[in-house]
């Protein structure tokens, strides 16, 4: 062994020389006395310190320093160095708040001797190391740089943090008029007397639900835009929450993907960085606002109307349920069931009126922003029709009949108790805001601002309702600019609206007007052909609290008709439409009104309204497969045709219970309809196919079906392919630029013909061109 070899090697050394020991001989903990053989101990003969004395046998070297304290050899050893434990610098570890900036530095695990060869684990294939040397500190410095920055994302949208929200001078310098506070539980409404506020209570957590409030935010952004205002959207630092809402808006408004919208916002505000949960929700939102085809797992979606946050219990939003089935319904609430064939609003027997109203508004938002083309039906607990349960069974085959046997009013889901309790206390006046506004620190009752989101929906609804009652005598235009809404002229007494809504017409997305025959969500204009297929999107949130019930009209459209025609309503002379987006950009001249379309782009005639007030709202499903926003209606009750076409758009119309008359028309003594030739209005008593002259325009009132069982009539305007306006220009409004037959608004002419023929003003008008499909008209003529 080493210690023994050293001792033996020193036997031949000259007397008086130092005895050298290896440190390992004294520090070897593995060597024990029992391991040394007895023969070895006898062979260890070490010379004595006195050179003249004989050799003597010495005991073996001590095992440890502690076992031999007085040895001279121990004194000869170099002093032992203390063990060095190096502590890592504090800067190399993550600091508090690193998760707030979105990046975690990844320091190596503390190790011993770095110069020696050690086993290393290569994680390059599984984890990408942060290569930016300034990742943590620079990120915080960057946030500090944007602390006082009011970042402009769009003409009317600015993004920032709390530091800007509390600085009135910065807000004023940027022309801010409205503020959306995303962190109501942290930041109060600092300058409520100077700006219009709305608040959300969003946690910067991946589990926070932002999908349910996106459409309310879209409404707010559009409301600000129509007022030519500017809105400042802020959270604490302007990094995650506020930027997520703006990204979602750009995805809908501009038709951008999530990546494009995110990069656009990030170019305006370099620290924009939605958390992972928000990003996932925005990717799901992208599929909806771009009208992507539904996946098999998304065929059935069910929403429960509930408060978005306990801080604002009257802000009701549709929250997506994880288990969509009849067992998820609760008699205390309102639910939205979205199927490929229809959208149902299920109202429980104990549901409050406020919740039912907001559910109807939420459905209109879904139809508008997601471009839903399905009928919308309201069913009440206990009165569910059979087709309602059949719709469930078609998606969930395992649903049995036992679901229907639940007693009406007894449906209850315990998981909803907290939401309903919060909401019930709020409507009973038991809710007091946790954070008083800056200019009133003594609020002891529920302030109006706590329900501001519902009031915004009512604002759109009231304006839309006024338009409907006004149009009962003069139909609205079916071809809209990107604003899609019609504004009353200043001279019309019935056009009085609030000051906040008269600045400009309501503003809808240009992407909400798209080609009906294309799966692409973006709009498609065709200037070369002089016509395009435009499908108006659903109107803004509609909430009409004065109406008490909703019913569904049966479809009166034949399969051919549902695939075929599409006419256009003429705007009232007392109304004007805002210029379209294409016109404002200068890329499209003239009106986007397209009276003459191919057969594939035509639809059934537009609806008309009864002038008197009504107590019912009817979701009419007739003739809107190709984008008719306002289909016709004779208001014949609430019976439902189970064979309704799947793709139809909602149309909200009013009709009186006491005025459900049948549309009539003039006939001769033999019962044959009286036709006339336009513009001379020459009556044609014996109508036949021979009278369909290529150089004439013939107005023909005919039954809506071949057998005439429905009793309703349509006014068909047959336009010959050789008809010319050369001698009839005076009969066409010169303001409409009707230089050709294609540019004539034949629906307006049809309304004039209705008056001259003493036909009901609500008679649907259909345009039939000789150069296009005439199958329906010829079939009706042959049946006479």
UniProtKB/Swiss-Prot annotation:
Active site: 235 (phosphocysteine intermediate)
Disordered: annotated span: 1-73, 94-118, 488-586
Pfam families noted in UniProt: DSPc, MPK1_gelsolin_C
Binding site for substrate: 235-241
Compartment list: Cytoplasm, Cytosol
GO molecular function, one term: MAP kinase tyrosine/serine/threonine phosphatase activity
Low complexity bias spans: 22-34, 489-510, 521-553
Record domain Tyrosine-protein phosphatase: where: 149-291
An example Gene Ontology CC term for this record: cytosol
Processing and modification events after translation: Phosphorylated on threonine and serine residues by MPK6.
This enzyme's EC code(s): 3.1.3.48
Positions where Phosphoserine occurs in the chain: 558, 572
Modification Phosphothreonine occurs at: 64, 109
Compositional bias of kind Polar residues: 554-577
Enzyme class name: hydrolase
Consequence of gene disruption: No visible phenotype under normal growth conditions in Wassilewskija (Ws) ecotype, but Columbia (Col) ecotype show growth defects, elevated levels of salicylic acid (SA) and constitutive defense responses.
Keywords linked to the UniProt accession: Cytoplasm, Hydrolase, Phosphoprotein, Plant defense, Protein phosphatase, Stress response
Entry function: Protein-tyrosine-phosphatase that acts as a negative regulator of MPK6 and MPK3 signaling by dephosphorylating and repressing MPK6 and MPK3. Modulates defense response by repressing salicylic acid (SA) production, camalexin biosynthesis and SNC1-mediated responses. Acts as a negative regulator of MPK6-mediated pathogen-associated molecular pattern (PAMP) responses, including MPK6 and MPK3 activation, accumulation of extracellular reactive oxygen species and inhibition of seedling growth. Involved in UV-B stress tolerance. May be involved in salt and genotoxic stress responses.
Note: The observed mkp1 phenotype in Col ecotype is largely due to the Col-specific TIR-NB-LRR receptor-like protein SNC1, which is absent in Ws ecotype.
Quaternary structure and partners: Interacts with MPK6. May interact with MPK3 and MPK4.
Protein name, per record: Protein-tyrosine-phosphatase MKP1
Gene behind the chain: MKP1
